[in-house]
Amino acid sequence: MKNNNAYELYQANSTMVESPIKLVEMLYEGILRFCAQAKRYMEAGDIEKKVYFINRTTDIFTELLNTLDYERGGDVATYLTGLYMHQIKLLTQANVTNDTQKIDIVINVAKGLLEAWREVNADELMQYES
């Protein structure tokens, strides 16, 4: 238990020093990781863990929604709002119906978002590679 608390403290501190661009990258990576786990537990019939990881993924999309800047982001922010809301809807449907295909859709969207984010912000993200 002590190691788990130390890890959580490390994670909390590491997010305090990351740039907003790196944090968004980490959120997209978290979506991919949690969706994969939700799908695995869905296929295994472990309802409790499936729900846990779907909820974690939904929480990330909610956080991404909360950080959108409509003044600076304009049409892109509006588009992302609809996209994120649709992913939350798909996750909810996947949770209720145990439909792994809906999780696959969310995974594919998140992969595209992560790839685009990395491409647009390549220069700043390179600072975190070393």
Model-based region annotation:
Residues 1-37, 41-44, 48-55, 62, ...:
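N-terminal intrinsically disordered, cationic/polar leader segments
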